[in-house]
């Protein structure tokens, strides 16, 4: 018979720590949140603005496209501008096809980047492949930069895929084409990592990723990678899609492998709405890690979904206002109120679960449901502290939350000084 502990997260997989511009990935460090810009990197103003927005939202690493000379020339200027803004955010260069040439022709770019991303599927073709891969690895060694060897099923090494398909056809019990593709993805990453080490790049400068667009494929390839190596792993479901579909798919896939102790850094690859907010992917990544109990970024607001007992929208509006206010203030509060990210607030809509849920929170309120007495008990640290009445219940509770934060977490700030 299973015990309660059988369902806890599996221990984190042991991986080699990699220092990416001062941010540690792997080696037991907290799972790192990262994101990527969608600006033209040569447009310095727009790229700086988007990197800054992603960084403020909580992205600890930011990847930028380096696809031509103009982009490469812009990288050190982008880095300098960010530093002038007080943002020491590690920038990752995303290279495809001509990365070896861009790094060689633009040494200031090679120096300014914190990490290089290489795709084994398009770093070079035929007899040029290993040579051009080696040139990038040699640049990483020269500038003491880590690399991410990022395999993507959409640009998979066709020579390796063909070879494994041929071997599979000759096997007595052949695998499905999908299974062979998974194996090819994993082998491509491991073969490339071995080659990088042979050239002289140490394992503590290598991160691996294996991007696919289907949930079950992601679970399979990362489970396979985790069994066959101890490299730090970058998780991400490529082409996850837009809106709720992209969020659900990314959460289902990465949630499973994270629960099994696999993964050292994550990116949620959401397709934004036209002119949409790019920082949404950062928020989703943070929320995924937080709801699973792996990290804490922003205070949690628990709120009931509502039912026939809660025909008023007051509790919904209050929960939304408090959540928005907490998130908006976190850039300042993170330094002003150490530990505030662990705060739990409950905003409940009626008497059924309201008092009980509120007692479990640090501070909670149980608003009156339909037909209930127009009074709202407030619970602080598990004890009923007061009852709010009248037309200003919502604003009164917001003031109580602010006061609670100041009294509880402001003391930590004073003690630290």
Swiss-Prot record:
Record note on cofactor: Binds 1 [4Fe-4S] cluster.
InterPro entries attached to this UniProt entry: Dihydropteroate_synth-like_sf, IspG_bac, IspG_bac-typ, NO2/SO3_Rdtase_4Fe4S_sf
Gene Ontology BP annotations: isopentenyl diphosphate biosynthetic process, methylerythritol 4-phosphate pathway; terpenoid biosynthetic process
Cofactor field: [4Fe-4S] cluster
Function: Converts 2C-methyl-D-erythritol 2,4-cyclodiphosphate (ME-2,4cPP) into 1-hydroxy-2-methyl-2-(E)-butenyl 4-diphosphate.
Organism: Rhizobium rhizogenes (strain K84 / ATCC BAA-868)
Listed name of the protein: 4-hydroxy-3-methylbut-2-en-1-yl diphosphate synthase (flavodoxin)
Pathway(s) served: Isoprenoid biosynthesis; isopentenyl diphosphate biosynthesis via DXP pathway; isopentenyl diphosphate from 1-deoxy-D-xylulose 5-phosphate: step 5/6
Pfam family of the protein (one): GcpE
Domain of life: Bacteria
Gene responsible for this protein: ispG
Sorted UniProt keywords: 4Fe-4S, Iron, Iron-sulfur, Isoprene biosynthesis, Metal-binding, Oxidoreductase
Family recorded in the similarity comment: Belongs to the IspG family.
Xref: SUPFAM superfamilies: Nitrite and sulphite reductase 4Fe-4S domain-like
EC annotation from Swiss-Prot or TrEMBL: 1.17.7.3
Known catalytic reactions: (2E)-4-hydroxy-3-methylbut-2-enyl diphosphate + oxidized [flavodoxin] + H2O + 2 H(+) = 2-C-methyl-D-erythritol 2,4-cyclic diphosphate + reduced [flavodoxin]
Gene Ontology MF terms: 4 iron, 4 sulfur cluster binding; 4-hydroxy-3-methylbut-2-en-1-yl diphosphate synthase activity (ferredoxin); 4-hydroxy-3-methylbut-2-enyl-diphosphate synthase activity (flavodoxin); iron ion binding
Record-listed [4Fe-4S] cluster binding positions: 304, 307, 350, 357
